[in-house]
Amino acid sequence: MKLFYRKIGSGQPLLILHGLFGQSDNWNSLAKLFAEKGFEVFTIDLRNHGLSPHDDEWDYETMSKDVLELITDCNLQQVDLIGHSMGGKVAMRLAIDYPELINKLIVVDISPKYYPIHHQSVLEALNAVDFSILKTRKEAETVLSNYITDFGTKQFLLKNIYWK
């Protein structure tokens, strides 16, 4: 799958993988800082997030292969890799399967263990949104409000909505 990414700077390649419900621009301010420090920074929208394609297949092995495809397509070698939360799981899987491609690995806010489901209310809220009839983010927010009371969480989820 061809993932959407943003690139800034030049130097040692640094790939940044966001967490669940995140997207590439979550890391814009740090990407600029890393670019100033001599990195070619790739902030990536993982599958089913941001501007990357959506697909029913969605597991860490598949997601790591998506990142591998990006590395290959961009002719990158020995990348530094930062993964946050879900992106950390993807980064760890990539590092295990393709250690020769990874120079440095930084995993933020996750560990290599199984976690029980804990986003059930968020998933129920997202499943309740019928995008075939909604036309605006405000309409989606109204549906989400039936499940999620926290303003910040709702806004974070709404940021990931794109009509094509």
Language-model regions, residue ranges each:
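Conserved alpha/beta-hydrolase catalytic His-Asp/Glu region
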Residues: 132-164
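Active-site glycine-rich loops that stabilize anionic/oxyanionic intermediates
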Residues: 11, 19-22, 85
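Alpha/beta-hydrolase fold catalytic core
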Residues: 1-14, 36-39, 76-77
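Active-site loop/oxyanion-hole signature of alpha/beta-hydrolase fold enzymes
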Residues: 28-36, 40-42, 46-82, 86
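Structural cue for short, hydrophobic secondary-structure segments
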Residues: 16-19, 43
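Flexible "cap/lid" loop of the alpha/beta hydrolase fold
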Residues: 92-97, 101-137
